[in-house]
Amino acid sequence: MSTQYLNSNLKVFSLNSNKELAEQIAKHIGVGLGKCSVDRFSDGEVQINIEESIRGCDVFIIQSTSFPVNEHIMELLIMIDALKRASAKTINIVIPYYGYARQDRKARSREPITSKLVANLLETAGATRVITLDLHAPQIQGFFDIPIDHLMGVPILSDYFETKGLKDIVIVSPDHGGVTRARKMADRLKAPIAIIDKRRPRPNVSEVMNIIGNIEGKTALLIDDIIDTAGTITLAANALVENGASEVYACCTHPVLSGPAIERIQNSNIKELVVTNSIVLPEEKKIDKVHELSVAPLIGEAIIRVYEEESVSVLFN
Protein backbone atom coordinates (compact mmCIF):
# COMPACT_ATOMS: atom_id res chain seq x y z
CA MET A 1 0.00 0.00 0.00
CA SER A 2 1.35 3.41 -0.98
CA THR A 3 1.61 6.03 1.77
CA GLN A 4 1.84 8.96 -0.65
CA TYR A 5 -1.53 10.41 0.36
CA LEU A 6 -1.51 9.70 4.11
CA ASN A 7 -0.91 13.31 5.11
CA SER A 8 -2.57 14.95 2.12
CA ASN A 9 -5.87 16.79 1.79
CA LEU A 10 -7.41 13.72 0.15
CA LYS A 11 -10.07 12.25 2.44
CA VAL A 12 -12.13 9.12 1.80
CA PHE A 13 -15.29 8.45 3.80
CA SER A 14 -17.62 5.47 3.77
CA LEU A 15 -21.28 5.38 4.70
CA ASN A 16 -23.24 2.17 5.32
CA SER A 17 -23.90 0.71 1.87
CA ASN A 18 -20.55 -0.91 1.04
CA LYS A 19 -17.88 -0.50 3.71
CA GLU A 20 -15.83 -3.46 2.49
CA LEU A 21 -15.43 -1.91 -0.97
CA ALA A 22 -14.63 1.47 0.62
CA GLU A 23 -11.86 -0.13 2.69
CA GLN A 24 -10.40 -1.75 -0.43
CA ILE A 25 -10.50 1.59 -2.28
CA ALA A 26 -8.83 3.42 0.60
CA LYS A 27 -6.14 0.72 0.75
CA HIS A 28 -5.48 1.07 -2.98
CA ILE A 29 -5.09 4.84 -2.61
CA GLY A 30 -2.96 4.53 0.52
CA VAL A 31 -5.16 6.30 3.06
CA GLY A 32 -7.32 5.28 5.98
CA LEU A 33 -11.05 5.81 5.90
CA GLY A 34 -12.16 9.12 7.38
CA LYS A 35 -13.73 9.07 10.82
CA CYS A 36 -17.47 9.58 10.87
CA SER A 37 -20.45 8.04 12.62
CA VAL A 38 -23.69 7.16 10.85
CA ASP A 39 -26.43 6.42 13.37
CA ARG A 40 -30.20 6.62 13.70
CA PHE A 41 -32.34 8.67 16.05
CA SER A 42 -35.03 6.71 17.89
CA ASP A 43 -37.59 7.61 15.21
CA GLY A 44 -35.34 6.33 12.40
CA GLU A 45 -33.94 9.65 11.17
CA VAL A 46 -30.31 9.58 10.00
CA GLN A 47 -27.72 11.15 12.31
CA ILE A 48 -24.23 11.80 10.92
CA ASN A 49 -21.21 13.26 12.66
CA ILE A 50 -17.85 13.88 10.97
CA GLU A 51 -15.23 13.21 13.61
CA GLU A 52 -12.23 14.96 12.06
CA SER A 53 -11.51 18.29 10.38
CA ILE A 54 -12.06 18.33 6.63
CA ARG A 55 -11.71 22.09 6.13
CA GLY A 56 -10.10 22.75 2.74
CA CYS A 57 -9.94 19.03 1.88
CA ASP A 58 -10.91 17.15 -1.27
CA VAL A 59 -13.41 14.66 0.10
CA PHE A 60 -14.62 11.46 -1.59
CA ILE A 61 -17.70 9.66 -0.23
CA ILE A 62 -18.17 5.98 -1.12
CA GLN A 63 -21.86 5.05 -1.19
CA SER A 64 -23.78 2.76 -3.52
CA THR A 65 -27.47 3.61 -3.56
CA SER A 66 -28.47 -0.06 -3.42
CA PHE A 67 -30.94 -1.80 -1.11
CA PRO A 68 -32.29 -0.25 1.04
CA VAL A 69 -32.16 2.40 -1.68
CA ASN A 70 -33.98 5.26 0.04
CA GLU A 71 -32.03 4.85 3.29
CA HIS A 72 -28.73 4.99 1.45
CA ILE A 73 -29.74 8.01 -0.62
CA MET A 74 -30.72 9.92 2.54
CA GLU A 75 -27.41 9.01 4.22
CA LEU A 76 -25.57 10.35 1.18
CA LEU A 77 -27.54 13.60 1.03
CA ILE A 78 -27.09 14.27 4.75
CA MET A 79 -23.36 13.49 4.54
CA ILE A 80 -22.96 15.92 1.62
CA ASP A 81 -24.70 18.63 3.63
CA ALA A 82 -22.47 17.96 6.65
CA LEU A 83 -19.32 18.18 4.52
CA LYS A 84 -20.47 21.41 2.89
CA ARG A 85 -21.14 23.00 6.28
CA ALA A 86 -17.73 21.79 7.50
CA SER A 87 -15.97 23.72 4.68
CA ALA A 88 -14.75 20.84 2.51
CA LYS A 89 -13.00 22.19 -0.58
CA THR A 90 -14.65 19.67 -2.93
CA ILE A 91 -17.31 17.02 -2.29
CA ASN A 92 -16.88 14.11 -4.69
CA ILE A 93 -19.51 11.40 -4.46
CA VAL A 94 -18.48 7.92 -5.57
CA ILE A 95 -21.59 5.89 -6.42
CA PRO A 96 -20.52 2.45 -7.69
CA TYR A 97 -24.20 1.53 -8.18
CA TYR A 98 -26.58 4.39 -9.01
CA GLY A 99 -30.07 3.50 -7.79
CA TYR A 100 -33.18 4.65 -9.67
CA ALA A 101 -31.19 4.57 -12.94
CA ARG A 102 -33.87 2.41 -14.54
CA GLN A 103 -36.36 5.29 -14.26
CA ASP A 104 -34.56 7.48 -16.80
CA ARG A 105 -37.51 8.46 -19.02
CA LYS A 106 -41.30 8.56 -19.15
CA ALA A 107 -42.18 5.12 -20.44
CA ARG A 108 -45.88 5.70 -19.73
CA SER A 109 -48.10 8.70 -19.11
CA ARG A 110 -47.79 10.54 -15.79
CA GLU A 111 -44.60 8.76 -14.71
CA PRO A 112 -41.69 10.50 -12.93
CA ILE A 113 -38.10 10.60 -14.18
CA THR A 114 -36.60 9.55 -10.88
CA SER A 115 -32.98 9.28 -11.98
CA LYS A 116 -33.12 13.00 -12.85
CA LEU A 117 -34.73 13.76 -9.47
CA VAL A 118 -31.89 11.97 -7.66
CA ALA A 119 -29.32 13.94 -9.70
CA ASN A 120 -31.06 17.19 -8.70
CA LEU A 121 -31.06 16.19 -5.03
CA LEU A 122 -27.34 15.37 -5.04
CA GLU A 123 -26.41 18.64 -6.73
CA THR A 124 -28.65 20.74 -4.51
CA ALA A 125 -27.18 19.11 -1.41
CA GLY A 126 -23.73 20.31 -2.50
CA ALA A 127 -21.94 17.59 -4.48
CA THR A 128 -19.24 18.97 -6.78
CA ARG A 129 -18.40 15.80 -8.78
CA VAL A 130 -19.78 12.31 -9.36
CA ILE A 131 -17.81 9.13 -10.04
CA THR A 132 -19.99 6.19 -10.99
CA LEU A 133 -19.84 2.83 -12.72
CA ASP A 134 -21.91 1.43 -15.60
CA LEU A 135 -25.02 3.56 -15.44
CA HIS A 136 -28.05 1.64 -16.68
CA ALA A 137 -28.73 4.53 -19.07
CA PRO A 138 -25.59 6.48 -20.11
CA GLN A 139 -27.69 9.57 -20.84
CA ILE A 140 -28.10 10.01 -17.08
CA GLN A 141 -24.73 11.78 -17.27
CA GLY A 142 -26.62 14.64 -18.91
CA PHE A 143 -28.91 14.96 -15.88
CA PHE A 144 -26.01 16.49 -13.94
CA ASP A 145 -24.61 20.00 -14.31
CA ILE A 146 -21.46 19.04 -12.41
CA PRO A 147 -18.59 16.88 -13.73
CA ILE A 148 -19.33 13.16 -13.85
CA ASP A 149 -16.83 10.38 -14.53
CA HIS A 150 -18.60 7.31 -15.90
CA LEU A 151 -16.38 4.26 -15.46
CA MET A 152 -16.99 0.92 -17.18
CA GLY A 153 -16.92 -2.61 -15.82
CA VAL A 154 -16.26 -4.27 -19.19
CA PRO A 155 -12.43 -4.17 -18.87
CA ILE A 156 -12.56 -5.92 -15.47
CA LEU A 157 -15.00 -8.57 -16.67
CA SER A 158 -13.24 -9.18 -19.99
CA ASP A 159 -9.83 -9.50 -18.33
CA TYR A 160 -11.22 -12.24 -16.09
CA PHE A 161 -12.65 -14.23 -18.99
CA GLU A 162 -9.47 -13.77 -20.99
CA THR A 163 -7.54 -15.57 -18.23
CA LYS A 164 -9.98 -18.51 -18.34
CA GLY A 165 -8.87 -19.37 -21.86
CA LEU A 166 -12.36 -20.20 -23.14
CA LYS A 167 -12.56 -21.38 -26.76
CA ASP A 168 -15.00 -20.37 -29.50
CA ILE A 169 -16.59 -17.56 -27.49
CA VAL A 170 -19.55 -15.57 -28.70
CA ILE A 171 -20.64 -12.51 -26.70
CA VAL A 172 -24.40 -12.35 -26.27
CA SER A 173 -26.55 -9.35 -25.42
CA PRO A 174 -29.79 -10.44 -23.68
CA ASP A 175 -31.69 -7.60 -25.40
CA HIS A 176 -31.28 -4.87 -28.01
CA GLY A 177 -30.46 -2.24 -25.38
CA GLY A 178 -27.26 -4.00 -24.35
CA VAL A 179 -25.70 -4.32 -27.81
CA THR A 180 -23.18 -1.49 -27.28
CA ARG A 181 -21.95 -3.13 -24.08
CA ALA A 182 -21.71 -6.53 -25.76
CA ARG A 183 -19.76 -5.05 -28.66
CA LYS A 184 -17.21 -3.52 -26.26
CA MET A 185 -16.72 -6.90 -24.63
CA ALA A 186 -16.48 -8.58 -28.04
CA ASP A 187 -13.84 -6.09 -29.20
CA ARG A 188 -11.70 -6.81 -26.14
CA LEU A 189 -12.01 -10.59 -26.46
CA LYS A 190 -11.87 -10.53 -30.28
CA ALA A 191 -15.11 -12.49 -30.46
CA PRO A 192 -18.31 -12.23 -32.52
CA ILE A 193 -21.59 -11.08 -30.98
CA ALA A 194 -25.13 -12.38 -30.92
CA ILE A 195 -28.36 -10.72 -29.79
CA ILE A 196 -31.46 -12.18 -28.20
CA ASP A 197 -34.58 -10.67 -29.70
CA LYS A 198 -37.51 -11.06 -27.31
CA ARG A 199 -40.96 -10.94 -28.88
CA ARG A 200 -44.43 -11.48 -27.41
CA PRO A 201 -46.58 -12.70 -30.36
CA ARG A 202 -49.84 -11.64 -28.73
CA PRO A 203 -51.14 -10.73 -25.27
CA ASN A 204 -51.02 -13.42 -22.56
CA VAL A 205 -48.61 -15.54 -24.61
CA SER A 206 -45.08 -16.28 -23.39
CA GLU A 207 -42.22 -14.32 -24.92
CA VAL A 208 -40.38 -15.98 -27.77
CA MET A 209 -36.60 -15.59 -27.77
CA ASN A 210 -35.11 -15.41 -31.24
CA ILE A 211 -31.32 -15.49 -31.45
CA ILE A 212 -29.63 -13.24 -34.00
CA GLY A 213 -26.16 -14.60 -34.72
CA ASN A 214 -24.37 -17.95 -34.78
CA ILE A 215 -24.09 -19.64 -31.38
CA GLU A 216 -24.20 -23.32 -32.33
CA GLY A 217 -21.33 -25.27 -30.75
CA LYS A 218 -19.91 -22.10 -29.19
CA THR A 219 -19.30 -20.92 -25.64
CA ALA A 220 -21.87 -18.19 -25.06
CA LEU A 221 -21.03 -15.31 -22.74
CA LEU A 222 -24.05 -13.23 -21.69
CA ILE A 223 -23.29 -9.70 -20.51
CA ASP A 224 -25.61 -7.21 -18.81
CA ASP A 225 -25.19 -4.18 -16.56
CA ILE A 226 -27.70 -5.22 -13.88
CA ILE A 227 -29.09 -8.61 -12.90
CA ASP A 228 -32.09 -8.09 -10.64
CA THR A 229 -34.51 -11.03 -10.40
CA ALA A 230 -32.43 -12.96 -13.01
CA GLY A 231 -35.51 -13.78 -15.09
CA THR A 232 -34.16 -12.39 -18.36
CA ILE A 233 -30.63 -13.76 -18.00
CA THR A 234 -31.69 -17.31 -17.05
CA LEU A 235 -34.32 -17.54 -19.80
CA ALA A 236 -31.69 -16.29 -22.23
CA ALA A 237 -29.24 -18.96 -21.04
CA ASN A 238 -31.85 -21.67 -21.53
CA ALA A 239 -32.64 -20.38 -25.02
CA LEU A 240 -28.95 -20.40 -25.95
CA VAL A 241 -28.53 -24.03 -24.89
CA GLU A 242 -31.72 -25.04 -26.72
CA ASN A 243 -30.30 -23.43 -29.86
CA GLY A 244 -26.99 -25.26 -29.71
CA ALA A 245 -24.57 -23.35 -27.46
CA SER A 246 -22.10 -25.78 -25.88
CA GLU A 247 -22.04 -23.92 -22.53
CA VAL A 248 -23.18 -20.58 -21.13
CA TYR A 249 -21.41 -18.08 -18.88
CA ALA A 250 -22.90 -14.80 -17.70
CA CYS A 251 -21.55 -11.58 -16.21
CA CYS A 252 -22.78 -8.24 -14.95
CA THR A 253 -21.43 -5.21 -13.13
CA HIS A 254 -24.25 -4.79 -10.61
CA PRO A 255 -25.57 -7.94 -8.86
CA VAL A 256 -28.86 -6.70 -7.40
CA LEU A 257 -30.02 -10.35 -7.23
CA SER A 258 -33.36 -9.74 -5.56
CA GLY A 259 -36.29 -12.08 -4.96
CA PRO A 260 -35.90 -15.47 -6.69
CA ALA A 261 -32.63 -14.54 -8.46
CA ILE A 262 -30.28 -16.95 -6.68
CA GLU A 263 -32.66 -19.90 -7.02
CA ARG A 264 -33.12 -19.15 -10.71
CA ILE A 265 -29.37 -18.92 -11.31
CA GLN A 266 -28.72 -22.12 -9.36
CA ASN A 267 -31.27 -24.03 -11.46
CA SER A 268 -30.31 -22.48 -14.81
CA ASN A 269 -27.95 -23.49 -17.61
CA ILE A 270 -25.49 -20.79 -16.53
CA LYS A 271 -22.17 -22.45 -15.70
CA GLU A 272 -20.71 -19.40 -13.93
CA LEU A 273 -22.02 -15.91 -13.14
CA VAL A 274 -19.28 -13.29 -12.76
CA VAL A 275 -20.20 -10.08 -10.92
CA THR A 276 -18.42 -7.14 -9.29
CA ASN A 277 -18.59 -5.87 -5.71
CA SER A 278 -20.33 -2.61 -6.66
CA ILE A 279 -23.14 -3.94 -4.45
CA VAL A 280 -22.58 -5.95 -1.27
CA LEU A 281 -23.26 -9.63 -1.89
CA PRO A 282 -24.64 -11.25 1.29
CA GLU A 283 -23.21 -14.64 2.28
CA GLU A 284 -26.43 -16.45 1.39
CA LYS A 285 -26.06 -15.23 -2.21
CA LYS A 286 -22.44 -16.37 -2.57
CA ILE A 287 -23.26 -19.69 -4.18
CA ASP A 288 -20.63 -21.72 -6.05
CA LYS A 289 -21.87 -20.46 -9.42
CA VAL A 290 -21.25 -16.81 -8.49
CA HIS A 291 -17.74 -15.36 -8.76
CA GLU A 292 -17.06 -11.82 -7.50
CA LEU A 293 -14.45 -9.38 -8.86
CA SER A 294 -13.37 -6.15 -7.16
CA VAL A 295 -13.79 -2.72 -8.73
CA ALA A 296 -11.66 -1.13 -5.98
CA PRO A 297 -8.49 -0.70 -8.11
CA LEU A 298 -10.50 0.97 -10.90
CA ILE A 299 -12.34 3.36 -8.58
CA GLY A 300 -9.25 3.98 -6.47
CA GLU A 301 -7.27 4.96 -9.56
CA ALA A 302 -10.09 7.27 -10.67
CA ILE A 303 -10.04 9.01 -7.28
CA ILE A 304 -6.27 9.49 -7.46
CA ARG A 305 -6.52 10.96 -10.96
CA VAL A 306 -9.32 13.33 -9.98
CA TYR A 307 -7.35 14.47 -6.92
CA GLU A 308 -4.16 14.96 -8.98
CA GLU A 309 -6.16 16.72 -11.72
CA GLU A 310 -5.10 14.11 -14.28
CA SER A 311 -7.12 12.60 -17.12
CA VAL A 312 -9.54 9.84 -16.15
CA SER A 313 -10.27 8.78 -19.74
CA VAL A 314 -7.32 6.35 -19.79
CA LEU A 315 -9.30 4.17 -17.36
CA PHE A 316 -12.02 3.66 -19.96
CA ASN A 317 -9.59 1.34 -21.76
Swiss-Prot record:
Binds 2 Mg(2+) ions per subunit. The active site is at 198. SMART domains: Pribosyltran_N. One of its GO terms (cellular component) is cytoplasm. It is an enzyme of class 2 (transferase). ATP binds at residues 43-45, 102-103. Pathway: Metabolic intermediate biosynthesis; 5-phospho-alpha-D-ribose 1-diphosphate biosynthesis; 5-phospho-alpha-D-ribose 1-diphosphate from D-ribose 5-phosphate (route I): step 1/1. Mg(2+) 1 binds at residue 136. Disulfide bonds: none annotated. D-ribose 5-phosphate binds at residues 200, 224, 228-232. Transmembrane segments: none annotated. Mg(2+) 2 binds at residue 175. It catalyses: D-ribose 5-phosphate + ATP = 5-phospho-alpha-D-ribose 1-diphosphate + AMP + H(+). Its main location: cytoplasm. It comes from the Bacteria. Pfam families: Pribosyl_synth, Pribosyltran_N. It is found in: Cytoplasm. GO terms for molecular function: ATP binding; kinase activity; magnesium ion binding; ribose phosphate diphosphokinase activity. GO terms for biological process: 5-phosphoribose 1-diphosphate biosynthetic process; purine nucleotide biosynthetic process; ribonucleoside monophosphate biosynthetic process. HAMAP family: RibP_PPkinase_B. Involved in the biosynthesis of the central metabolite phospho-alpha-D-ribosyl-1-pyrophosphate (PRPP) via the transfer of pyrophosphoryl group from ATP to 1-hydroxyl of ribose-5-phosphate (Rib-5-P). This is Ribose-phosphate pyrophosphokinase.
